[in-house]
Amino acid sequence: MFIVFYLILIIFIFIYFHVYINLKIKSNSILRKFKSEVDKTIIEINQATDRNINIIEIKIESLNRIIKEVDERIEILDQRLLGFNNSSIPGNSPSSFGSKSDGIYKSNLDYSMPTIEKNIIKESYNVRNQIILLHEQGMSFEAIAKKFKLDLGEVELIISIHRGGVHEKMDRY
């Protein structure tokens, strides 16, 4: 009788440990899945951060080029101003001012918009026009924001600026 009791006890202990070990294995697999998801999320965050850092570095380089270009233009204008002041000194004829070197100044003084951001400006202008057109067709702010992957506030700002500009133009007439 004791042998049967011990045999039944051993079987229950075996079943208990078998179930216990299976639960541990399942919880470990859940933990592994959770850890892999967290690792993937961290990798995605790192990639987004790297992308943002690269964008910021490109903007910094762009601004440095613009600053360099502006400094060169300031230096050219200073030289031109100095040349103008020197031409007003007696002995220098005003007609000779700029005759030889004016071509250099004119070629260096290009008063156009910096070429670095032209495409970005055109692209943002097209997006702005598309947003205004979609809003005028009755699309909601949320749908427009989702379509262009913009914040809701940005879309509302673009529309409100457009409305303000239209009302100002109408008030003038």
Swiss-Prot record:
Keywords: Membrane, Transmembrane, Transmembrane helix. It comes from the Bacteria. InterPro entries: DUF6115. It is found in: Membrane. The chain crosses the membrane at residues 1-21. GO terms for cellular component: membrane. It is a single-pass membrane protein. Its main location: membrane. To T.pallidum TP0711. This is Uncharacterized protein BB_0265. The lineage of its organism: Bacteria, Pseudomonadati, Spirochaetota, Spirochaetia, Spirochaetales.
